[in-house]
Amino acid sequence: MTTGDADVTVKNARIHVEGAIRSAVWCGGESHLKVEDSVIDSKDADPFDNDFRSLSVPMMKCVPFALGLDGNCRATNVLEAGQVTYENSIVVAEKWAPLSTDSGYPPTSLTVKNVLAGVGALEEAVPGKAYTATKTVAGKTWGYTMGGSGYVAYGDGGVTNLFEDCQFY
C-alpha cells in the first residue's frame, strides 16, 4: 500500500492476499508504485461466511451487483492520483479486477508492460498440466487458469491506462 507522495519499487516479490477488500496492490494519494519481476494474486473471501456478512466498511466490499459480476477482492486498486507501473509480472484476481482504478482523477493511471493478467487461478506450474497460459517470472514458471466473472482492466473516466505487450484473460 502506498499513499501520500511515496515513491516505492517492489522487485522480485510474491504477493498473495485472501479476503474481502484486501487488494494485493493499493496505491493512492499522489504516490508512485513500480512493481517489477513479481507475481501478484488475490483470492476472494467466502461471501456466505459470517465474518464477511457482518463486515461494515465505508467502501465497496464487493463488486456492485448491478454489473452482473461476482467478487470481493481486487488484485490492484489505484485511487486518487496514484500511479502504478507493472513490468514483467503476473497479476491475477480470482474473480474481479486484476488491474483496476477506482475513484481516481488525472493522472491516476496504470502502466503495464510485458504482463500476464487475468481473472482465475494461479499456481506454480506443474509439468504436464494444461493451463490457459504460463509465464516465467524471476526464474519460476507459473500456470494461470482462466475463471471467474470479472473484468481484467478498468479505468474511471479521465484517467490514463497504458498497456504494452500484455496477455489479458
Where are these regions (language model features)?
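Internal alpha-helical scaffold/solenoid segments in large eukaryotic proteins
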Residues: V17-S23, A93-L99, T108
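Short linear interaction motifs
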Residues: I15-E18, G68-D70, V91
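Polyanion-binding and phosphate-handling cores
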Residues: V25-G28, H32-D37, N77-E87, V92, ...
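Acidic/polar low-complexity surface segments
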Residues: M1-T2, G29, I40-N77, W96-P106, ...
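All-beta strand scaffolds that present successive hydrophobic residues in beta-strands
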Residues: D7-A13, H32-V39, M59, Q83-N88, ...
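Extracellular beta-helix/beta-solenoid repeat scaffolds
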Residues: M1-V8, N12-K43
